[in-house]
């Protein structure tokens, strides 16, 4: 048996590694580099370039140079994120015959699996050159949040490249394998993986050679490419302001800007300021134009702050699903080139409350983990057991449109689960099994993966036939569903292969809708409560001003009236925090009024003051309550 290699097929760069004895080794490519740009280009004379040679000529050949192809793999052409990507890349994204997103050069269409296969071939050749023997088998990594279609498309890419893909492994899990290989201590780790195109976070328990994934979460359209694009947007906006020329329609200029943006981003990880100089970026009637400006780290951080913050919510969800708090995480492992950014490290440290572990190379650790898994499958690595999970719940539609889960998200894979259902009507001779993926209680709110019919059920009263539905998820995360009539033993099987995969928007909708609906309701309730507080305070303060306004100075009275006006203005908006702040300002401003009221009540022998003071006491009466929908397990399930 030949060597099994481990490949990290990345959005921006790819890397290949192999086990040498008991140690994994990253293999240098023909150019002497340990990583290879995931870029494929076609020249004027039809030559295909892969890696660094393709990257070098990208500026002069933008329409035939394909990068960040991983963002299209397993997606349909109509996917909103495909449409978004069309506006971000200089090459043409076209509709494939099967409705998937493909790319086009010189009138010829290529599937993302094909383009990815060219990069995989380069990785295969790199390994063969080092090992001096043919390589036919590999372990390939994918983002943990990749869906079934994206995993299938990645396996297809391996096949096109001449590789038998023995296992598809999740990137954060691979990183954990590499991190934990030589470490004897047990513990709970978080892998924060912010790569070129995708973000994943996984919580794992490690001990005695067992790597058990407790939960995973992520965003399949968030990564370094987006950081680069923010810089490009800033540069084009500044240039338009200065020169009045829009560079966004100039593909050559955009490609130069993209390269400059990536270079500036990398420099700003170690420097606090960098200079971007692009002479002859364009020209108009008055002559050539040059772009030259300084970009500070602070400005760059402000441009991408929301992107960095977007990584925190998946971290929060992963912790919740794993049933652990941030303080219970023993180590945070950073993976992906974008984690070199100081701001990212700072945000991770603030969230987890500890300095992230920087002992692994973020560009190589995933490929090393893939090589370790290859070693496990080959028998070279002993005493290592990897237990991964499925990222979303799977189930079927039952009577009344209810989504009945058979396999919950974050269930360890491989797994198999069966459940017996029955008919909804008398003498029903067929049932339609509709397979869904998601977290909502009603099937229609989730993603339909596929459907099939089980026919030939013998006539019987409703509720009598016994139909066994079995879900089977293999170690690659790929789904099979079987329905069987227990009376006749007739069965029908479907391998879930969505034509274009799930969109990122769909996945976010599935996971978020169940939890975020509750979160949105909570936020709406909080807004109503702070508005009520603000309005009550205005009413009480105005009443007090009319009664005791002559007891305070004109300056104090003016401050109170200004604070009332500011709060009224805030109440017209939807910003709860802003309303709270203005409410607090009015409380502070009306303190003098409270003192005057108290003094007056003392003089009059009154028992105490009312109005603004009483509102002050009540400002913390808001009770926040999280709630969860509880599934009725005893509910009778019928198909």
Swiss-Prot record:
Protein name: Chaperone protein DnaK
Key word Phosphoprotein present: yes
Species this chain originates from: Methylorubrum extorquens (strain PA1)
Parts forming coiled coils: none
Ranges where the record places region Disordered: 598-639
Superkingdom of this protein's organism: Bacteria
Single GO term (MF): ATP binding
In-chain residues carrying the UniProt-annotated modification Phosphothreonine: 198
Keywords: ATP-binding, Chaperone, Nucleotide-binding, Phosphoprotein, Stress response
Induction details: By stress conditions e.g. heat shock.
Transmembrane segments: none
Recorded family membership: Belongs to the heat shock protein 70 family.
Matches recorded under Pfam families: HSP70
Role of this protein: Acts as a chaperone.
């Amino acid at each position: 048996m030949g060597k099994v290699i481990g490949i990290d097929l990345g959005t921006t760069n790819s890397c290949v590694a192999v086990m040498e004895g008991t140690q994994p080794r990253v293999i240098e490519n023909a150019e002497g580099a340990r990583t290879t740009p995931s870029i494929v280009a076609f020249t004027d004379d039809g030559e295909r370039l892969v890696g660094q040679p393709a990257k070098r000529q990208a500026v002069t050949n933008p329409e035939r140079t394909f990068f960040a192809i991983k963002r299209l793999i397993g997606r349909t052409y109509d996917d909103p994120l495909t449409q978004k990507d069309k506006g971000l890349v200089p090459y043409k994204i076209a509709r494939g015959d099967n409705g998937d997103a493909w790319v086009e050069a010189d009138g010829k269409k290529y599937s993302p699996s094909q383009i990815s296969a060219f990069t995989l071939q380069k990785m295969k050749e790199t390994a063969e050159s080092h090992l001096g023997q043919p390589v036919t088998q590999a372990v390939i990594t994918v983002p943990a949040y990749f869906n079934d279609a994206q995993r299938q498309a990645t396996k297809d890419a391996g096949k096109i490249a001449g590789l038998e893909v023995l296992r598809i492994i999740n990137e954060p899990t691979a990183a954990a394998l590499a991190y934990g290989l030589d470490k004897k201590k047990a513990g709970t780790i978080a892998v924060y993986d912010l790569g070129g195109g995708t973000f994943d976070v996984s919580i794992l328990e490690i001990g005695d050679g067992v790597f058990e994934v407790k939960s995973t979460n992520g965003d399949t359209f968030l990564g370094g490419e987006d950081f680069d694009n923010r810089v490009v947007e800033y540069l084009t906006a500044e240039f338009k302001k200065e020169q009045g020329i829009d560079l966004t329609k100039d593909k050559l200029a955009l490609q130069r800007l993209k390269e400059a943006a990536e270079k500036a981003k990398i420099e700003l990880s170690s420097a606090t300021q960098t200079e971007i100089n692009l002479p002859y970026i364009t020209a108009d009637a008055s002559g050539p134009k040059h772009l030259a400006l300084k970009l500070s780290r602070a400005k760059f951080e402000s441009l991408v702050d929301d992107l960095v913050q977007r990584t925190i919510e998946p971290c929060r969800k992963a912790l919740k699903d794993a049933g652990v708090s941030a303080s219970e995480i023993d180590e945070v492992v950073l993976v992906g080139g974008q984690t070199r950014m100081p701001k990212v490290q700072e945000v991770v440290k603030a969230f987890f409350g500890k300095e992230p572990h920087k002992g692994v190379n973020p560009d190589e650790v995933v490929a090393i983990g893939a090589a370790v898994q290859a070693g496990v499958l080959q028998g070279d690595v002993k005493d290592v057991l990897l237990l991964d999970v499925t990222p979303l719940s799977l189930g079927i539609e039952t009577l009344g449109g209810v989504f009945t889960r058979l396999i919950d998200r974050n269930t360890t894979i491989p797994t198999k689960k069966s459940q017996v259902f029955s008919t909804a009507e008398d003498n029903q001779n067929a049932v339609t099994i509709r397979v869904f993926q998601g977290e909502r209680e009603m099937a229609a709110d989730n993603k339909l993966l596929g459907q099939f019919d089980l026919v030939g059920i013998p006539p019987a009263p409703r509720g009598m036939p016994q139909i066994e539905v079995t879900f089977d998820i293999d170690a690659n995360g790929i789904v099979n569903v079987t329905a069987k009539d227990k009376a006749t033993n007739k069965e029908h099987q479907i391998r879930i292969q969505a034509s274009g995969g799930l969109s990122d928007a769909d996945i976010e909708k599935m996971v978020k809708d169940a939890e975020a609906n509750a979160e949105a309701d909570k936020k709406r309730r909080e807004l109503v409560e702070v508005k009520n507080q603000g309005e009550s305070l205005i009413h009480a303060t105005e009443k007090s001003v009319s009664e005791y306004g002559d007891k305070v100075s004109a300056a104090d009275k003016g401050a109170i009236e200004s604070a009332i006006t500011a709060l009224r203005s805030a109440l017209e908006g939807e910003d709860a925090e802003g309303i709270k702040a203005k409410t607090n300002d009015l409380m502070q401003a009306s303190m003098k009024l409270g003192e005057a009221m108290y003094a007056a009540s003392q003089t009059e022998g009154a028992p105490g003051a009312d109005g603004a003071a009483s509102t002050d006491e009540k400002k913390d009466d808001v009770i926040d309550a999280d709630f969860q929908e509880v599934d009725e397990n005893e509910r009778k399930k019928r198909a």
